Amino acid sequence: SAQALGRVDPVTRALIPALHPSTTFQRDADGSYSSGRAYSRPHNPTYDEAEDLLAALEGGHDCLLFSSGMAAANAVFQALLPGDHVVAPKMMYWALRKWLVDFAIPWGLRVDFADIQDLGTLEAAMRPGRTKLVWLETPANPMWTITDIRAAADIAHGAGARLAVDSTIATPVLTRPITLGADLVVH
């Protein structure tokens, strides 16, 4: 993975990016930050490198790092609007399912849990024009079932929805969902 970006530190010649856990950055004489970085929490060079690397490994355009997989998943669902329809798998990471039931549904998301490994069931769960997101895990936790990502993407896109794939278990070493038609990948 160190070679995926093909970057070499111009000062140290290191192939592995340096870690910048917390720092402030030098201001220009006029008080501005020409580097675009003022403090490492919102703009961290280590995060930038990691995000670029993950995007390259996944075959994606952009990447955002979060403090946890749950934070990343929550960001995907919270990008939707109350009233939007979501199709999620019956068998999925328990903590995320509980968050959907306890928080997302009361907030106003319309969530149908379906056996989306069965593509006919997935197609039947879609509400063309109203379904905004299909969320799938493959392999799915905890039974390691596999869903055909390309077919699920075709079904989602045919109904005007986006496909998000939780690929935590497979990682881009084994599966690259974006190359199979997914719109978002979460780890």
Protein language model features and the residues they cover:
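A general structural signal for well-ordered alpha-helical segments in protein cores
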Residues: 18, 47-51, 149
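Glycine-rich beta-alpha junction loops
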Residues: 6, 21-27, 169-171
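Conserved N-terminal alpha-helix of the aminotransferase class I/II PLP-enzyme fold
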Residues: 24-71, 79, 95-104
